[in-house]
Amino acid sequence: MSVPIVETSLHYFVIYCSKLGQKEGTEHEKILFFYPPTINIGEQTNSVGISEAYVLFTKQFSPGQPCEFIHTKKSTLALLHPEEDIWMVLSVYNPTGITGKDNKREYIEDEVDDIILMKTIQQIYQTWQTFNGSIMSLASKTSYDNVRKRLESFVKPYIQQIQFDQLDLFTSLDGIKFLPLNKNVYLTIFGYINSVDLHFQSTLSSFRFGLVLYKDNLILSSLEQNETRILYNYLINMVKVGPDINSSNSMIVKNNSNNIPIWQTKGVRTGFMIQKDSLPMVWLGGKPQAMIVYEQKDTFLLFLIDPSDLPQLPFEDLSASLVQNFEFVNLTLEQHYAKKANFDEQYKYIYFNQMNLAIRSPIKPKGPELNKETMKLLNEIHADFEGGLSSEIIVKTQQDRWIVAKKIDFREFYIMFDNKNSSILEINEEVKNATTKFFKFLFTD
C-alpha cells in the first residue's frame, strides 16, 4: 500500500448530556457542544443517537466497562464518560490511500491509534475542568444554555488547534520533561522560591508557588501529580513556553469582565502573563484558585492564591521579590540545560517513567525524526507494552531504521538507529553499550 494521500482528520467532536431530550422530538437538546458547526442539527442528533446505541448494546456484554472505541470503515471513534450523564465523543476520519492496479481509493482502518485518541479526548476534558470546574456543577449553578455558551467559547478554540494527523507517541505518553539538577542547584532554586513564598504567606496564607519551568522542563512542583501534568501541558502545548515561545498560534486563558475564562493570543510579554484583574481561576482539589504566571527570559514561575486573598496581593511587591536574585537563578538553569542538550545530541531516544510521568527525549514532538512509519510502529509497540509489565522488541523499518524498545517495570525506553547495514546482533550490542555508558541511570531508582 502506498503512503496515504489523505491523512487523518477530524470528523466531529460532541459533548452531550444523556438525561436531556427524553421526549420524542427533543433529542437535539442532549447536545451541549458540537464541532464542526457546519454539520446540520439532524446529523448531529443522529451522531449522538448512534453513540448511545453503541453504549447500550455493549453494556450487555460488559456492564461495568463502558464502550470506549468504535471502529468503522471510514472513521474511528473514542468515547469518554467523565461525569455522570456526560459523554464526549471524538470521531476522526481514517486516512485513505491508493491500492491496486485500478488506483482505487481505500480507507486504511488500522492507521488511527486508540490510545492517542483517548488521551486527546481526556486532555480536552481535563483542560476544561481545570479552568471551569465540572460540566454538571456549572449546569446546576447556572443553566444548560449557559453551559452550551461556555463550552462553545472555551472548547472550540482548543479543538481547532489540534493537528489530528500529527498526534504521536508523545501524545500517548503524556509525560513531563524534567531538568536534572544536582543537590546544590536544587537547593538554590528551592531557596529562591521559598523566600518568595514565606514573604507573602505571612500576610496571605493561601499564597503558594505551584510550578517552576525552564524552557519546556519542569524544575519544581508543589502540586499533585495529575494537576502538575495538566498545568504543564497547558503551558507547553497551548501557551507554548519553551522552544515554541515565539509561536504565532500560542494561546493563554484569561478571565473576561464577567469572570468567564476565555482564550486570547498570548503576545510577547516579560513579567506577569496576565494582569491582576484578568487572572484565570483553576480548579485544584475541588476549589478555585487564582493562577499567576510570571515570565522572565526562559524561566516561568506559577503561583496560586485563594480568590478572596487576591485583592490584598500587591503585584508590584511580588514582581520586585521575583526580580531579586533572578539573574543568578536563570544563569544556573541555563548552564544545566546546556549540559543536558550536549548529552541528548548523541542518540535518538524516548524514555518514559510511568511512576513520576518523567519523559526524556531529544526528539521534538511532530519533528522530522518521527516520519509516518516510525510513528505508527512506536504507537503499536507502546500499545503492546500497555498489556504487559516487561518486554523487549527490535524492529527494522522499510526505510532501514532500527527501533529497539524495552519495558522494565514501569519504564519504557525507545532508541532508534539509522544504521541500515547493521545486523540485529550489531544493533543489540550497540544498545547494550549505549545503555551501559549513557542510559544506565534510566533503569535505576
Swiss-Prot record:
Coiled coil: none annotated. It comes from the Eukaryota. It holds the Pfam family Intu_longin_1. One of its GO terms (biological process) is vesicle-mediated transport. GO terms for cellular component: intracellular membrane-bounded organelle; Mon1-Ccz1 complex. Belongs to the CCZ1 family. This is Vacuolar fusion protein CCZ1 homolog. It comes from Dictyostelium discoideum (Social amoeba). The lineage of its organism: Eukaryota, Amoebozoa, Evosea, Eumycetozoa, Dictyostelia.
